[in-house]
Amino acid sequence: MKKLTIREMTYCALFAALTAVCSQIQIPLPLIPINLAIFAVVLCGGLLRPVCALLAVGVYVLLGLVGIPVFAGFKAGVGTLFGNTGGYIVGYVLAAFLTAVLRQRWGEGYLRLCAAMAVGVAVCYVFGTVWFMVLSGNSLWVSLSYCVLPFLPGDVLKILLAALLTGRLKKAMWR
């Protein structure tokens, strides 16, 4: 495995911080708030190699687990991870990693980036929905109505914007 460069370590830290900031930009809903964290997660997957994307979002999750209020609504701790949004938080790590892997395999074109990011978001939906079903005891359809349907339009826009920014930022970041 290739060692991380100083530049890559810096980008990992920056994306952990960006995810924390984007988590705070939210529209509160009764059970699960809409926020910009998934935007930062797929942007991370679009710009960093898989191991760096995994580390960046993993650091974000670890910061929240040890008590630093980086999760949506300035929440933190193990209790947040085992709450309604815990599945999404766990899903962020895999979403960033999978987005980066698919970007490497499928290529850097805009539509290919959008597809890779959509798969990453879908994985996050799966984790979030299953987690919510287990905690709440709700059926799949009820859980989908709380955990996926309200998020779809905004997440499509986040994917489109993240893919656009990836193309523009990649050139500047890796000169």
Residue ranges, per PLM feature:
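Hydrophobic transmembrane alpha-helices
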Residues: M1-L54
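Membrane-helix interface segments
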Residues: T5, P50-L55, W106-R112, S139-L140
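Hydrophobic residues within alpha-helical transmembrane segments
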Residues: L14, G58-L62, G86, L94, ...
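Alpha-helical membrane-inserting segments
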Residues: L18, C22, Q26, C44, ...
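Interfacial aromatic-anchored transmembrane helix boundaries in multi-pass membrane proteins
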Residues: S23-P33, V61-A95
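Non-cytosolic membrane-interface motifs at loop->transmembrane helix junctions
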Residues: P33-I38, V78-N84, W141-F151
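Membrane-embedded alpha-helical hairpins and interfacial helices in multi-pass inner-membrane proteins
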Residues: F74, E108-R175
